[in-house]
Amino acid sequence: MHAAQARLERRQALRHGSLLPHAPQTVGFFCMDVSFISATLVLPAVVAALAPEGSRWAGDAVILVKPQFEAGREHVGKGGIVRDPAAQQLAVDRVEAAVRGLEGEALALIDSPILGMEGNREFLLHARFA
């Protein structure tokens, strides 16, 4: 019971940025792999936490895009699998839109060499923020 509660608090804290209040200002790269929440909800908090006060963060990121958390419940099939390539692309499009919304640029996308839990196809997105 306590472990699940701790994970929920941690997830909630990360989404709202309070997990990163003392992040070093010299960070030029981050890698993000989140579960049970959309990367689009966490990304703004991470970018804001890494930004020097009064300015924007500049650097590169690799974001693991997990369609089962990005495409919407209506696209998730039995066992939590997103099988439809159009739904997988929708998931990627949503994360790329979140990057652009933070004045970033999606530079490259590859299939993750590791399948997600239950065999989901996942993607690695290289983004740059300037």
Residue ranges and their predicted role:
Residues 67-84:
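Short, glycine-/aromatic-enriched active-site segment of Class I SAM-dependent methyltransferases
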Residues 40-62:
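A short glycine-rich, Lys/Arg-flanked "PGG" loop and its adjoining helix->strand segment in the class I
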Residues 114-130:
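Core SAM-dependent methyltransferase catalytic element
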Residues 1-42:
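S-adenosyl-L-methionine
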